[in-house]
């Protein structure tokens, strides 16, 4: 039963991500990378970013506390606590609302210091509309958490699908009639999100209460528990803010170009790399819980080996076909900045491997109940990213921001591995470096073959890229087989034995 639920939610999430990608395609098709898209992206990010600095830590602590309260005191107590939290967050939202509404220009300069003239005027108008989102997004976050406690996963997972369809329609209406409909659509989507969740909330018999107690012990406890999440979330938002404000100074449409390139990058990470980590992580957590250090050491090395095997060939193929990928995905309608987006994508793809490794190692630290080390590592990464952003954007423009992000991820991933090795002496990553060399050689051979064959193809269509990729992956797999990687050989041997056993 649980496997069916997980599979169903996985399918819904995949469809949601695909419709989200279509939403980005619609925006690029109708408005390209322009002052309008820059203004829209900044205006809609301001409410979320400011709230994330304050409220996301509270929301992350909500589910365990509310779940515990429901088990101990029943549904009414959990509903009442949810209402008190909502009322508390509404107060925070109202303060944020008035600050943004009356100091719009000053706040925009924090988010996009390079905005001037028409783009600034447009962003001010958009922001005054988009700020209303904050109230509805709070409700969506809390209600989604409450429904998850009551095992109502499907509608929460499916919310993104109709929301993205509304965004696509909104982009068309804004293009056809007036671009002010872009931020208006964002507000409509947030209102729709709340309405969408009302039906499952009725099924669990949730009733909203206006009562609020600032001295509530559980609220105070939740605030205390939310501090690590708040710090981590704040660091992430600062990193995001720095990238965008520097991009706003480099070129008109720069924020949009980086947004489109990073969306492509995140799509690959989400569809191909994150599932690998999701599959590997439960076994890691089990080894840590049972204190099987030798088994854990071996499994971490194996997990990183699998990540290397998946990430490196994807990285090199994305580098080879970056321009073709951008052309196929975005190269239509009003979108003209193919070269700039392709260069940004090339630099972002360098981070495929460090993103995956870092995500895995962070989860290892969390399993050891160590939340401090990843937060310190994130803080260090932000400092590195800011320094590299300022330096590289001067010399290579917009691409420098993408490169700075990737380099900071490489550095933080490497330092996190070293920290893990020092903290837990039984760990050694010498085996991983040997695997890396073998996978890198296999990937290099694959790359040479693809580049050689690419010379003989005049126009690269989707079909020709697919064929070259398949040929490249076959070469890569054969080469990798002859590299004699222990865990891979063991895996193949076990599969052969199990196949013989079923006959």
Residue ranges and their predicted role:
Residues 451-503:
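Membrane-proximal transmembrane or re-entrant/amphipathic helices at the cytosolic face
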Residues 5-28, 32, 189, 193, ...:
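Transmembrane helical elements of multi-pass membrane transporters/channels
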Residues 2, 198-234, 291-294, 422-437:
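Interhelical loop/hinge segments that connect adjacent transmembrane helices in multipass membrane
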Residues 154, 161-195, 372, 379-414, ...:
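Membrane-interface helix-loop junctions in multi-pass transport and translocation proteins
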Residues 135-158, 350-380, 391, 395:
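Membrane-interface junctions at transmembrane-helix termini in multi-pass inner-membrane proteins
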Residues 56-72, 273-292, 297-304, 362:
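Helix-loop junctions and terminal segments of transmembrane helices
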Residues 106-129, 319-351:
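Interfacial segments at transmembrane-helix termini and the short loops linking adjacent helices
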